[in-house]
């Protein structure tokens, strides 16, 4: 067999083995299966005629949430810890504030009451199971618009992770309040001890 014929046969064989592009997943995550994850990125909040921005890191370990906010929006640095029963805020001076004081501090710093319990689920691109909700085009996944607790959450971009679509960019609005979230990095673990 000549060299030219050999190259032709090899080219045809490799062409038949080419891998077709894989479409991104079109399903939203099941919150019960996504209990352990971290997300970090940027956020901007406008409320009461004022606005601010900052960076954030969100860690979810089962029912426990740890949200760290840095930059002007957090007035330096602020960490929010929730477990479904209590809320604790650690401010830039290292002071730990219990539920009532923590809620007042968040309202003062952010200019509004953010639905943090629901936001845990909105971060995943799904409604919170704790209150009624409506989903636009429910038959289409991933979810593009959620309406819940007086808020409208619109999703613009998604990233593939563990076979599902996770939000990269979304905006939550209620009246004159507008929260924009951009996730730069997702890390998802299947069980405790496996990361993230």
What are these language model-derived features?
Residues 1-17:
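Sec-dependent bacterial lipoprotein signal peptides
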Residues 13-34:
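Bacterial Sec signal peptide processing site at the extreme N-terminus
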Residues 33-73, 77:
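Post-signal-peptide N-terminal segment of Sec-exported extracytoplasmic proteins
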Residues 49-51, 73, 92-94, 148-150, ...:
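Glycine-centered tight beta-turn/hairpin loop motif at sheet-sheet or coil-to-beta transitions
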Residues 56-59, 80-82, 155-160:
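Extended lipid/amphipathic-ligand handling interfaces
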Residues 64-115:
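An acidic-aromatic
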Residues 93-149:
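Flexible, processing/modification-adjacent segments and terminal tails
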Residues 125-196:
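Gly/Pro-enriched, hydrophobic low-complexity segments
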């Amino acid at each position: 067999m000549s060299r030219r014929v050999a190259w032709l046969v090899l080219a045809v064989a490799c062409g038949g083995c080419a891998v077709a592009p894989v479409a991104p997943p079109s399903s939203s995550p099941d919150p019960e299966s996504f209990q352990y994850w971290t997300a970090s990125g940027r956020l901007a909040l406008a409320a009461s005629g004022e606005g601010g921005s900052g960076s954030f890191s969100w860690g979810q370990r089962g029912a426990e949430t740890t949200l760290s906010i840095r930059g002007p929006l957090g007035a330096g640095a602020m960490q929010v810890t929730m477990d479904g029963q209590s809320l604790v805020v650690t401010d830039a001076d290292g002071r730990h504030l219990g539920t009532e004081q923590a809620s007042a501090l968040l309202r003062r710093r952010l200019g509004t009451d953010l639905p943090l319990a629901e936001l845990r689920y909105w971060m995943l691109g799904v409604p919170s199971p704790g209150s009624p909700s409506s989903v636009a085009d429910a038959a289409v996944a991933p979810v593009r618009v959620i309406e819940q607790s007086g808020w409208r959450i619109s999703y613009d971009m998604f990233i593939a992770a563990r076979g599902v679509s996770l939000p990269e960019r979304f905006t939550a609005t209620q009246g004159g309040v507008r929260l924009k979230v951009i996730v730069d990095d997702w890390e998802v673990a299947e069980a405790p001890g496996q990361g993230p």
